[in-house]
């Protein structure tokens, strides 16, 4: 009977069978980006175009405290956003949940400008004196030659670049606006960045003192593929993140991993080696080449790949690969201790970890090899989208006007100071009277001046038209003056005005520098 049933099924499936055909073809199985599963989401195979959202910048935003309609408590409101509870805190400020007038939730990141200026000054004092590197940024006045990284313009340029250029699925884009709030002074105390809200928070909370529950193999692979695509895109833009860790990987409501926090990132010339001499980031995620004193220039790309490997280790095992409570012991373990995968039975994953966490940066796996590794692609059965498609959208450089807007906050103040400096400079020039110029001897000369005698009697005086009568005697008296002072008097220079002009010009130049740099 079983054979007869099988034969009937085969007969029904034959081309000549009289079975009724299906009126519509069956739909192909759909892939969803909401749940990591054995089948990778569509974003790993095809890049959906992301529309560029215009970023609104508001200077001197309106701030007020209002009574909540729910419980009567006071709410802090900035423009249309009501600031709610704090969800995180960093070195420059806190991150709060904000709700707009339509009930949409956003993440508002607060930046203390005082801390930004303090850090910019400290970086200026520690500025390296190594060989100069070409800079990708347009040259701006009041700044020293570039070294390929952000020096004096680090803080505001980094905020400016993030809010203008991060339009990518695995990199958190700026969602709404930039707000400056102060106390009515020209220089506000805080800046706020309104960004997309990743409601599921950080991918994992793991520290030297805290462990977490590890994720299964499929979730680790899915989110690590997101991380590969995001960091590959940043490297194509000439950006090295330098602080990749689980705390800086957020999960959206539809389970997309997004890279955040570019506070210590560096930007280089496109298609360069991206070598840096700075040490930045979390100690437990630093590569071995940065755990030594006077390490010199190291590859920023290789450092990011090491941090990606440590992040993957945390996701898979719920702990850090090197756990030491002393910084010196931690650095020694990172440099010398081999990586241990406790209880790992997957030899392919173990091979991946050994290649990512290679002590020698020259032998460490590179991004092109990493995206093709058998564990990442399931032995070639689930490849990532091509690199050319992932990095197709290279962002244009910001214009000088946009850079000035990001650095000076309001360039009108700089223009006003420059106009004032130009006016002070004009005061140094000789003041010509409307009537023919007379020498101190009383004779009229239209084309040249006459050198005064070496000595003159104090009683001698000449009446000349002057806009400042009370300065007349002092201006025209050449008695007991040095030779160059007598020349200035004859040519129309006022000694006190000359000195005052120099002082005012120097003060104006200092104000221009302070406004442009800090």
Swiss-Prot record:
Instruction: Enumerate the UniProt keywords alphabetically.
Output: ATP-binding, Calmodulin-binding, Cell cycle, Cell division, Kinase, Nucleotide-binding, Serine/threonine-protein kinase, Transferase
* InterPro entries according to UniProt: Kinase-like_dom_sf, Prot_kinase_dom, Protein_kinase_ATP_BS, Ser/Thr_kinase_AS
Q: Which SMART domains match?
A: S_TKc
Q: Any inhibitors or activators noted? A: Activated by Ca(2+)/calmodulin. Binding of calmodulin may relieve intrasteric autoinhibition.
Q: What is its EC number?
A: 2.7.11.17
> What residues make up the catalytic site?
243 (proton acceptor)
- Read off the domain note: The autoinhibitory domain overlaps with the calmodulin binding region and may be involved in intrasteric autoinhibition.
Provide the protein name. Answer: Calcium/calmodulin-dependent protein kinase kinase cmkC
Species of origin reads Emericella nidulans
Q: Which gene encodes it?
A: cmkC
């Amino acid at each position: 009977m079983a054979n007869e049933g099988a034969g009937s099924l085969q007969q029904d499936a034959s081309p000549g069978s009289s079975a009724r055909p299906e009126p519509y073809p069956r739909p192909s199985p759909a892939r969803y980006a909401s749940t990591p599963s054995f089948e990778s989401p569509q974003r790993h195979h095809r890049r959906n175009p992301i529309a560029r959202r215009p970023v609104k910048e508001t200077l001197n935003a309106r701030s007020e405290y209002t009574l909540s309609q729910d419980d009567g408590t006071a709410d802090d409101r900035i423009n249309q956003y009501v600031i709610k509870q704090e969800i995180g805190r960093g070195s420059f400020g806190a991150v709060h949940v904000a709700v707009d007038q339509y009930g949409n939730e956003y993440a508002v990141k607060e930046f203390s400008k005082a801390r930004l200026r303090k850090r910019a000054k400290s970086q200026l004092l520690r500025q390296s004196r190594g060989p100069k590197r070409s800079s990708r940024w347009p040259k701006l006045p009041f700044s020293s030659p570039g070294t390929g990284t952000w020096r004096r313009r680090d803080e505001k340029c980094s905020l400016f670049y993030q809010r203008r250029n991060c339009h990518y699925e695995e990199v958190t884009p700026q969602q709404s606006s930039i707000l400056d709030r102060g106390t009515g002074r020209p220089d506000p105390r805080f800046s706020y960045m309104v960004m997309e809200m990743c409601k599921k928070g950080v991918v994992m909370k793991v520290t030297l003192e805290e462990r977490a529950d590890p994720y299964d193999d499929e979730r680790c692979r899915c989110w690590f593929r997101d991380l590969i695509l995001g960091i590959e895109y940043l490297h194509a833009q000439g950006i090295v993140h330098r602080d990749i860790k689980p705390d800086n990987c957020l999960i959206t409501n539809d389970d997309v991993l997004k890279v955040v926090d570019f506070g210590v990132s560096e930007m280089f010339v496109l298609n360069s080696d991206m070598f840096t001499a700075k040490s930045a980031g979390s100690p437990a995620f630093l590569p071995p080449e940065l755990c030594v004193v006077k390490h010199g220039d190291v590859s920023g790309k290789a450092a990011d790949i090491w941090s990606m490997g440590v992040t993957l280790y945390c996701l898979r095992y719920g702990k850090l690969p090197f756990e030491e409570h002393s910084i010196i012991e931690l650095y020694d373990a990172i440099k010398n201790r081999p990586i241990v995968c406790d209880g790992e039975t997957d030899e392919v994953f173990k091979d991946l970890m050994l290649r990512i966490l290679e002590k020698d940066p020259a032998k460490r796996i590179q991004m092109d090899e990493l995206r093709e590794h058998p564990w990442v692609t399931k032995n070639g059965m689930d490849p990532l989208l091509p690199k050319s498609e992932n990095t197709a959208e290279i962002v244009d450089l910001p214009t000088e006007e946009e850079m000035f807007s990001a650095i000076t906050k309001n360039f009108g103040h700089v223009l006003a100071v420059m106009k004032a400096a130009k006016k002070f400079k004009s005061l140094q020039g000789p003041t010509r009277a409307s009537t023919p110029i007379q020498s101190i001897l009383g004779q009229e000369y239209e084309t040249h001046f006459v050198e005064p005698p070496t000595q003159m009697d104090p009683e001698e005086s000449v009446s000349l038209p002057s806009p400042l009568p009370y300065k007349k005697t002092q201006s025209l008296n050449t008695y007991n003056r040095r030779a160059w002072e007598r020349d200035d008097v004859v040519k129309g220079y006022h000694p006190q005005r000359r000195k005052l002009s120099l002082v005012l010009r120097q003060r104006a130049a200092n104000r221009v520098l302070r406004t442009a740099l800090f």
